[in-house]
Curated annotation (Swiss-Prot):
Reactions catalysed, as given in the entry: L-histidinol phosphate + 2-oxoglutarate = 3-(imidazol-4-yl)-2-oxopropyl phosphate + L-glutamate
Source organism superkingdom: Bacteria
Species for this entry: Bdellovibrio bacteriovorus (strain ATCC 15356 / DSM 50701 / NCIMB 9529 / HD100)
Keyword presence, Transferase: yes
Coiled coil regions, renumbered to chain: none
Record-linked InterPro entries: Aminotransferase_I/II_large, HisP_aminotrans, HistidinolP_aminotransfase, PyrdxlP-dep_Trfase, PyrdxlP-dep_Trfase_major, PyrdxlP-dep_Trfase_small
Record family assignment: Belongs to the class-II pyridoxal-phosphate-dependent aminotransferase family. Histidinol-phosphate aminotransferase subfamily.
Summary of subunit composition and partner proteins: Homodimer.
Single GO term (MF): histidinol-phosphate transaminase activity
CDD domains recorded: AAT_like
Annotated protein name in UniProt: Histidinol-phosphate aminotransferase
Pathway, per record: Amino-acid biosynthesis; L-histidine biosynthesis; L-histidine from 5-phospho-alpha-D-ribose 1-diphosphate: step 7/9
UniProt gene name: hisC
Length: 372
């Protein structure tokens, strides 16, 4: 049976190495995973309390309308429910947007070294991914992305993805850059602009602004959020979308009726209201980043100041060898060869003792492996 060439050539997304796999592979008992940008505090306590109360109802199907969660989202984010949609993680939102808007050989535009999910979802939906080189400092080059779109109508670009802040680089587009970009490509009928703001809550930069503030001005603007990071609910798989009502209506037609399970809805609803946990998550992130910066500087390793809960740094060595040596010491970081970075690793913020163990192990490994 013939398989589509787009599917055959698709390079699957490779997530961070699991703790259990590392323990089995290297014969370890203690392993610290600092590879997947998870919340080191775990899930929101209020979310877990709500989940425990909901366990007795799991013989029933989940609410297909996501009513309670949408009501809370509307209250917290200030948008009517007709502009909000829920997905099985941001991955489902990205995938279905590609399915909705792209026909065979249509284009999806983003940056080099952008979140890898765009590069997976586009060909999976028979579209073609186009990537513009990053600007200096590993930043999204929004002027170049806008110019590429405007100068290449033959590419039939239907979606533009901007991850802000970006994973894995941790860099961001400023408010002024976002505004200039939207003035060039906003309010068009031939393309949707999607800002993926999974790390929005961790941003410390004063000149950053969420694209949600421009929702009323641009009819082709979509904003994505996740519950996997600041809310600590990665295992529940839940993402949210802010979009024009007509986009939400079509999305809800295409998604599976029970795309988000009941426990995920209950957990997210409670987590949104756990302000103390959100603040604690921010503080542990910022403290951890500052610690990493200090230690990386002591080790003489270049790094990129991050607006996420992770930092990308240059080992100045073959990162695959560094990563292997770290794994043997029970430290899981994230190699970035699939993003084109041969000497870089991405390091997620953990608890204090995990961060310290990671830096001790890294210092040992650097002495063993010769710089390039």
């Amino acid at each position: 049976m013939k398989i589509s060439p787009e599917i055959l050539n698709l390079v699957p997304y490779k997530p961070g190495k699991p703790i259990s796999e590392t323990q089995r592979e290297y014969g370890l008992t203690t392993v610290y995973k600092l590879a997947s940008n998870e919340n080191p505090l775990g899930p929101s306590p209020k979310a877990m309390a709500a989940v425990k109360q909901a366990l007795d109802h799991q013989h029933l199907y989940p609410d297909p309308s996501h009513y309670e969660l949408l009501q809370t989202l509307s209250k917290e984010w200030g948008f009517p429910t007709k502009q909000l949609a829920i997905g099985n993680g941001s991955d489902e939102l990205i995938d279905l947007l590609c399915r909705i808007y792209c026909e065979h050989h249509d284009g999806v535009l983003t940056s080099a070294a952008a979140f890898n999910a765009y590069e997976v979802s586009a060909p999976a939906n028979r579209a073609v991914i186009h990537k513009v080189p990053m600007a200096e400092g590993y930043r999204f080059d929004l002027p170049a992305i806008a110019d590429y779109f405007l100068k290449h109508p033959e590419k039939n670009i239907r979606l533009i993805f901007v991850s802000n802040p970006n994973n894995p680089t941790g860099t961001y587009a400023t408010k002024a850059e976002v505004e200039a970009f939207l003035q060039k490509v906003g309010n068009r009928d031939d393309v949707m602009i999607i800002f993926d703001e999974a790390y929005n809550e961790f941003v410390r930069a004063k000149d950053y602004a969420s694209a949600q503030g421009y929702m009323g001005q641009y009819k082709n603007l979509i904003v994505l959020r996740t519950f996997s990071k600041i809310y600590g609910l990665a295992g529940f798989r839940l993402g949210a979308m802010i979009a024009p009502p007509e986009v939400v209506e079509v999305f809800n037609r295409v998604r599976k009726p029970f795309n988000v399970n009941d426990l995920a809805q209950v957990a997210a609803n409670a987590a949104l209201q756990d302000k103390e946990f959100i603040e604690r998550s921010q503080q542990i992130c910022w403290k951890g980043l500052d610690y990493f910066y200090k230690k990386l500087e002591e080790l003489g390793l270049p790094y990129i100041p991050s607006q996420g809960n992770f930092v990308m740094f240059d080992t100045l060595r073959d990162a695959a060898k560094v990563n292997e040596a770290l794994l043997r010491r029970g430290i899981i970081m994230r190699p970035l060869l699939n993003y084109g970075f041969k000497t870089h690793l991405r390091l997620s913020v953990g608890r204090d003792h995990e961060n310290e163990a990671a830096m001790v192990a890294l210092a040992e490994v650097l002495k063993e492996i010769t710089p390039l």
